[in-house]
Amino acid sequence: WFDINDMDEFRVFTINNRDFPDPKRMNKYLHDNGFHSVYMIDPGVKVDDNYFVYKTGKEQNAFVCDIYRNEFHGKVWPGACAFPDFTRPETRTWWSGLYKDFMANGIDGIWNDMNEPSVFDGPGGTMPENNIHLGGGNLPIGSHLMYHNAYGRLMVEASYNGMMAANPGKRPFLLSRSNIIGGQRYAAMWTGDNEATYEHMKLSIPMSITL
């Protein structure tokens, strides 16, 4: 399991070439020794015009807007981040396309984390309820309050389709921290980052029942 430290300065869809100079060779070594590799992909995209994910997303108007229709930025592991608007079919197609080159490194599975979405400096640890999702297809324009519970579900759909396109005929291994009913067709779930406390044990009961 490769967490955010395998990334280049926490940029999603990148690998830290200093510590992992040859990821294809490393993953082949793992395969030869009976292991599979699962890499993390979060929704937060570092705001950096020289970073290909942010640059291509910005060109396609792929990110969530604030109430004033400006691109919303919130802090996550890389610092200031933009967040894909997965209600837009064009955004889901763009996100799916990012998996092809990434999976070509010999990656076996993906875990989508922080996809409630988690925003460190946002109200309640997420983005403002009045942020705007533009929708498209059968999804109307709406506030984040309307789409919060669906955000992770729409993300894993895009991730699943990208993994299928990258490795046709191979069943994807995709794990998600956030999902809703129906999303299990795309990704399994886990119950988040739990601690060994009675409070978290109590919370784990309804969470496990609804997996």
Regions from the PLM with identified roles:
Residues 1-211:
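Catalytic-domain carbohydrate-binding cleft regions of carbohydrate-active enzymes
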